[in-house]
Amino acid sequence: PIHIPLPKISGRKRQKKFLKRLSDTISKLELSNSNNNYYFSYKEVNFKDMIFNKIRKNILPAMCDIHTQSTYLDKLLKQKRPTIIISNTSGGVFSILGDLSSLYGIPSLMIPQGSHVPPKNEYEMIEWKEHGLCLMNTPYRYLAVQSPWARAYLEKVPTKSKQIITGPLLFTSIENNKNRKTLLREKIIPEHKDDVILVHASTPKGRSMRLYVYERPDEYIENINSLIRAVETIENMHLIIRMRPLNYMKMFMLTEDVRDLLIQSDCYSIHSEGSFEDYLSIADMIVSYSSTTIEEALQNKVPVLQYDSQGKYCHIE
């Protein structure tokens, strides 16, 4: 495979022109509502300045980056004319990639990287529908349906993409091999190789990102601490807290921060290195609130405990 990075800076004149158009539009919007706070207040609290500050400092630069990258992407597709375009997400510039593939008549396939389950109430519907805009309801012509839960989701939230029932393509697959399991345990947790191993693998999100179907950082910590208290009372059991690699988790919490917030105990250890496949292979049970790891475990016939100490959400019923 050839990796072609998309630069964030194109021709200076083009970039300045696009930035000026956006800035002018934002200024007009702000001025048009200068005497009308109806849309920018709640219970007599005005948040207009906060909104426009967010637009100028965060949204506008992101839009400029996507605009620049889409320009290069357009040129790249015109030059290379690929036979097919395959992506695992449709967020940001990858959404533009799906649109351009339709524009140029290039077949495109979305293979979602995340878990999707059928919404069970109005709150889950709001968040899973939003989540689906990057993975299930996208501009890509074809959609790989990798699990029965994804299919059930699409029955409630239809997509314009043509569905292809593929089974798991991106999910982790492990060997049912006792010797390999033993060797991995000796390598990863030699002092607990003979214990019952629980692997906690969940996906916390920031407070602004789907705060119902995923754990907020504070809930993530509370749920793990609750588990630690339980595991401490059971002999010959060890809890592995599997965290995402640093480049992912730094968006929400660093390993050092999590370590500082957890109860001190010898019954658990924190791991962020190595592949999830290895940890799934050594687990007697996966523990999670909401994550693709739940589906990956079930696909590999590893028992799963869906754990929410508050009892508000159940990922798969």
Task: Give residue ranges: language-model regions.
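Active-site and donor-binding regions of nucleotide-sugar-utilizing enzymes
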Residues: P1-S173
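Donor nucleotide-activated moiety binding/catalytic core segment of transferases
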Residues: Q69-T71, E219, R242-N300
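Structural motif
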Residues: T83-I84, Y142, V196, H238, ...
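Short His-Asn-centered micro-motif
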Residues: I86-G91, I111-Q113, A144-S147, H200-A201, ...
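Anion (oxyanion) recognition and catalysis
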Residues: S102-L103, E232-T233, L298
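Catalytic binding pocket for nucleotide-activated donors in carbohydrate/polymer assembly enzymes
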Residues: P112, P158-I165, F252-S265, T292-E317
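Conserved catalytic-core segment of nucleotide-activated headgroup transferases in glycan assembly
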Residues: T166-V258
